């Protein structure tokens, strides 16, 4: 108990632990808020750089990203563009390649299936995944195949 008191720099160990837990909770909330703001900012950049394929808005995100943030970006874009839109993420989470596809409900009802698209492209990153017709993710082991996987997704989108 003396050692714990020294580590916490307090004679009242229980009070010091409660204070540390409260501070930790505040820091978590602050980090979550910062992540939400960053997601909004990145989503705005992705929206500004959209392309169009066969009358469909395609929003792409490449590069190193946290998987959880990519999902948040995809859904933020869907809120801004709820029809005729597809989000394609070809990202690295650490050294792990990740593919993310989100299609709007109207496209899912007309033959676009995010899960099918992701599964096909995931082969190129030596991975697998899936999800729902509107949203799917895949992870893999071959980061070198990420660019080819992105190209495959774009090829599939253009062919539907």
Label for each model-derived stretch:
Residues 1-160:
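Terminal appendage regions of diverse proteins
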């Amino acid at each position: 108990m003396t050692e714990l008191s020294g580590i916490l720099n307090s004679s009242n160990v229980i009070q010091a632990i409660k204070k540390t837990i409260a501070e930790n909770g505040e820091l978590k909330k602050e980090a979550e808020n910062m992540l939400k703001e960053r997601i909004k900012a990145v989503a705005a950049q992705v929206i500004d750089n959209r392309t169009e394929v066969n009358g469909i808005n395609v929003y792409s995100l490449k590069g190193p990203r946290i998987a959880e943030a990519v999902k948040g970006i995809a859904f933020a874009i869907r809120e801004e563009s709820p029809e005729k839109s597809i989000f394609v993420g070809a990202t690295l989470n650490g050294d792990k390649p990740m593919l993310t596809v989100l299609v709007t409900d109207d496209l899912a009802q007309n033959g676009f299936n995010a899960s099918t698209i992701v599964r096909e492209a995931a082969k190129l990153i030596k991975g697998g995944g899936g999800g729902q017709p509107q949203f799917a993710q895949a992870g893999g082991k071959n980061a070198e195949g990420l660019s080819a996987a992105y190209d495959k997704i774009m090829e599939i989108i253009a062919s539907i």
